[in-house]
């Protein structure tokens, strides 16, 4: 694919993670299986600790919310109180978490527990954050050219920092000027990008957003943000209309800043 120009008025690049900086398989084949394989072990080891108790409390509150709203819920009781029934209580939590993951839910309770487990795994060297080989050199080049670089992902800010803090390239957190997650809004809503621009202290048209998801690209465009769609192995296939509408890149090295060396 040809070189794609970053408009000369751009002050910041906003990067998606999954399918953009990082193989889409990393979450599906590494992060999520780690939770499934080590969940019961994690709960058993930390059951009496405050952080684990808070995680379970949030899961229980989510169940109560689901019941109140008549949502389907595989597990209607999460009881952490009885020491004699600890094994049963842990099993209930495991069943609930696995059900949420199978249902592709994104609840705060689930993301918090996952984040705590991944934090321990990264710190212990069990997991290293994957990034494409073109990512770090390109970001370094953009920063030398005076651009700021931010992350916007559906994964929590903590999860983002773990991935880049314990990456295969080492700790590269210093390459980023800030992180955004869905606390600022959904990635498919244009208002989210307006809020991000406000938080950055710049105009929407001074931002370029890189993502592999065209619904996100459209939302960003609707907010006045410039967009390039990233085509990586395993990413969702694009329609002919999408291919003709968007600037496409297969590597960050294709992006060139107009008027800067």
Swiss-Prot record:
It is found in: Cytoplasm; Nucleus. It catalyses: 5-methylsulfanyl-2,3-dioxopentyl phosphate + H2O = 1,2-dihydroxy-5-(methylsulfanyl)pent-1-en-3-one + phosphate. Pfam families: Hydrolase (PF00702). Substrate binds at residues 153-154, 187. Mg(2+) binds at residues 16, 18, 212. One of its GO terms (biological process) is L-methionine salvage from methylthioadenosine. Its EC number is 3.1.3.77. Keywords: Amino-acid biosynthesis, Cytoplasm, Hydrolase, Magnesium, Metal-binding, Methionine biosynthesis, Nucleus. Pathway: Amino-acid biosynthesis; L-methionine biosynthesis via salvage pathway; L-methionine from S-methyl-5-thio-alpha-D-ribose 1-phosphate: step 3/6; Amino-acid biosynthesis; L-methionine biosynthesis via salvage pathway; L-methionine from S-methyl-5-thio-alpha-D-ribose 1-phosphate: step 4/6. Binds 1 Mg(2+) ion per subunit. GO terms for molecular function: acireductone synthase activity; magnesium ion binding. It is an enzyme of class 3 (hydrolase). Monomer. Belongs to the HAD-like hydrolase superfamily. MasA/MtnC family. Bifunctional enzyme that catalyzes the enolization of 2,3-diketo-5-methylthiopentyl-1-phosphate (DK-MTP-1-P) into the intermediate 2-hydroxy-3-keto-5-methylthiopentenyl-1-phosphate (HK-MTPenyl-1-P), which is then dephosphorylated to form the acireductone 1,2-dihydroxy-3-keto-5-methylthiopentene (DHK-MTPene). This is Enolase-phosphatase E1. It comes from Salmo salar.
């Amino acid at each position: 694919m040809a070189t794609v120009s970053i408009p000369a008025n751009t002050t910041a690049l906003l990067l998606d993670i999954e399918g953009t900086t990082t193989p889409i398989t990393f979450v599906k084949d590494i992060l999520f299986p780690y939770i499934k394989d080590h969940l019961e072990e994690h709960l058993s080891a930390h059951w009496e600790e405050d952080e684990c108790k808070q995680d379970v409390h949030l899961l229980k509150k989510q169940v109560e919310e689901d019941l109140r709203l008549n949502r389907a819920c595989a597990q209607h009781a999460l009881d952490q109180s009885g020491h004699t029934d600890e094994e049963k209580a842990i099993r209930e939590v495991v069943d609930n978490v696995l059900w949420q993951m199978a249902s592709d839910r994104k609840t705060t309770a689930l993301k918090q527990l996952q984040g705590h487990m991944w934090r321990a795994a990264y710190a212990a060297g069990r997991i290293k954050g994957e990034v494409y080989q073109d990512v770090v050199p390109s970001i370094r080049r953009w920063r030398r050219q005076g651009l700021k670089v931010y992350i916007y992902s559906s994964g929590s800010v903590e999860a983002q920092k773990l991935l880049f803090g314990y990456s295969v390239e080492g700790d590269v957190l210093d390459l980023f000027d800030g992180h955004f997650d869905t606390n600022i809004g959904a990635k498919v809503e244009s208002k989210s990008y307006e809020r991000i621009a406000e938080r950055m202290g710049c105009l929407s048209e001074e931002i370029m957003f890189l993502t592999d998801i065209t619904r996100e690209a459209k939302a960003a465009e609707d907010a006045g943000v410039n967009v390039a769609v990233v085509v990586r192995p395993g990413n969702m296939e694009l329609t002919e209309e999408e291919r003709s509408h968007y600037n496409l890149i297969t590597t960050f090295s294709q992006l060139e800043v107009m008027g800067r060396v």
